[in-house]
Amino acid sequence: MTTTSEAQGIEALVHVTGAIRSAVESVIDGKPDVVRLAVTVLLGEGHLLLEDVPGVGKTMLAKALARSIGCSVRRIQFTPDLLPSDITGGSVFNQERAEFEFKPGAVFSNVVVGDEINRASPKTQSALLESMEERQVTVDGTTYRLQPPFIVIATQNPIEMEGTYPLPEAQRDRFMARVSMGYPPPAAELEMLERHGAHDPLATLEPVADAETVRRLVATARAVYAADVIKEYVVSLVRATRSSPDLRLGASPRSALHLMRAAKARAAMHGRAHVLPDDVQELVVPVLAHRLLPSADAQLARRAPADVLTGLLATVPLPRARPGA
């Protein structure tokens, strides 16, 4: 049974996330589903990977979300000569004090926009690993905590694009979700010409929240109830990827945690204090697909991981309420 305070928290979450989505959609035309997923990842304490060809608005979406929530934001342009210390920071000698002091890197921000992350070397890409999972950075044996909220929104071009490096499996697994922007519909593209021709909409975008508000929203989403049968459903879906003959690498235990958190966030955004199977099903592909590697036979048959997941959704039994539950 939902208490009055829980109901009020959910109501406030619906109101604020609606305002955030409206603010971002005032800049990003014709992509409401992508914007909704980005906000879901934010509430689920995850990180978002935006993958698509250049020029479809990946970086613009990341900047718009950061500005709409009124949090500190740093942008990292990933290039082949970018160093790990540029991301994490490092010790710099202070001549006045005659001692080394820590200079924070670009990762010390609420929102980190990693632009074209797969253009940097794997060594530099891996500099994000600790910060993404543990919300901390260790430099020269000293650990520095990152202040919440903390979200990495990384963009990458398809791997067949020139000058790109594939993201390691360990790093892909740390992104809660991946989404492709796609080209906008004709009407949205015309609206973009009108809107961006007159002024830069990002420059006039006003924040509709702040860091403290986002922290409260995250806590509200985390408290959403998930019944045991829902948790078992999530585990069944994840384990099904590991036994599928179409996949040579299935989903990790971390992916089950990400799927559960994202489902709770989606439920809260729909005004509910409990998770439904629909919440899980809606997020299976964006949360799991980028972690999976197809088998050789699946590649020959052109069966992408997203297609395999769609098939698993049709075969894994839906959860049923237990007698007396």
Protein language model regions, located:
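Walker A/P-loop
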Residues: 42-79
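C-terminal engagement/docking regions of AAA+ P-loop ATPases
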Residues: 2-7, 11, 241-325
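Pre-Walker A (pre-P-loop) alpha-helix and adjacent loop at the N terminus of AAA/AAA+ ATPase modules
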Residues: 9-56, 235, 239
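P-loop (Walker A) phosphate-binding loop of NTP-binding proteins
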Residues: 52-53, 87, 155
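Conserved beta-strand position immediately N-terminal to the Walker
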Residues: 48, 112, 150
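Conserved alpha-helical scaffold flanking the Walker A/P-loop in AAA+ ATPase domains
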Residues: 36-40, 93-114, 142
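Walker B catalytic acidic pair
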Residues: 52, 115-116, 127
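Canonical AAA+ ATPase core
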Residues: 94-99, 120-124, 132-224, 264-269
